[in-house]
Every structure is written in C-alpha cells, then in structure tokens.
C-alpha cells in the first residue's frame, strides 16, 4: 500500500515539474474587524510550461507561502492555449484588455527577444513566446496587465483556424493577403 502511494506521489511530481511559476506581486492587505486589523497576503502568480500554455492566478492567505500556493492552484485552473509560430512568436498583432489595462502585442523577427515590461513580460516568457513586441497602455496595475495579456493570447488564431472558419484552403488565404 505504501509503495503505491509513493508511485502516485512521484507521478504527481513528474507532472508538476514541467510547470514553472513566477510571483509577479505580493501585497500585504488588511481587513478591519471588531478586534482591530486582520493582516493577510495576496500573491499574483503566473504559471506556464513555456510550450504554449499559461495562466494567471491570485491567492490570499495569512502567510506568503500559503498565498503563493493558492495562486499557483488558481493559475492552473485558468490556463490558456497560445498558438506559437515556428520562430516562437505570435501569429498576428493583438490587443488585449483587462480592467483599465490595455496590452498591445506585435509579432517580431527571430532574435528580437521579448520586448515588454512588468507582468506582461512574465506572462509572455512563461507562455513560451520568444520574439514579441508588447506595450502596456492605460493602467500600471500588474494583475490587470497580466489578465489583459492573457486575454490577448487567448484571442490569437492561427492561419489554419481562420481558413477553417471561412471555409477556404490555407493557400487561398495567403493569396488574399
């Protein structure tokens, strides 16, 4: 019985080892209660496998480690599939919105790298995007910027998806542009 449990634990560890997590922000927040102020921590965590899957999670707990753990679990529940090109870029320009934040992304030539700041850079790197230009517009709130980036990445479509929706072949789609 104990041997079976060990195997299950090893399998879970192997499955989780492909995921990377990065903490974008840790904030100490307070709630006013009858006896005074109750302090807790809020962590914004980005989870990704650098192969086209990424998620943003928020966790709150009385200690930092618990908040990060909850944030990772929340991020894994909100995973987004990102279509990547051969040069590890995005297929087309995109604008994403989250709250008052607006993130503008454009594909870049191979060797350009990730030109973005703050939470946007973290989300793109953990999604596996290697060549992209991105700009944060509007809010500088890390959570809203991360969510806006996730919205933009979720809205990306490949050429084959667009051709399928229009009911034409991919070659005809290229000829039209």
From Swiss-Prot:
The gene is rpsE. With S4 and S12 plays an important role in translational accuracy. Located at the back of the 30S subunit body where it stabilizes the conformation of the head with respect to the body. One of its GO terms (cellular component) is small ribosomal subunit. Pfam families: Ribosomal_S5, Ribosomal_S5_C. Keywords: Ribonucleoprotein, Ribosomal protein, RNA-binding, rRNA-binding. GO terms for biological process: translation. PROSITE patterns: RIBOSOMAL_S5, S5_DSRBD. NCBIfam families: rpsE_bact. Part of the 30S ribosomal subunit. Contacts proteins S4 and S8. This is Small ribosomal subunit protein uS5. The N-terminal domain interacts with the head of the 30S subunit; the C-terminal domain interacts with the body and contacts protein S4. The interaction surface between S4 and S5 is involved in control of translational fidelity. InterPro entries: Ribosomal_Su5_D2-typ_SF, Ribosomal_uS5, Ribosomal_uS5_bac-type, Ribosomal_uS5_C, Ribosomal_uS5_N, Ribosomal_uS5_N_CS, Ribsml_uS5_D2-typ_fold_subgr. Residues 19-82 form the S5 DRBM domain. One of its GO terms (molecular function) is rRNA binding. Belongs to the universal ribosomal protein uS5 family. The keyword Transit peptide does not apply.
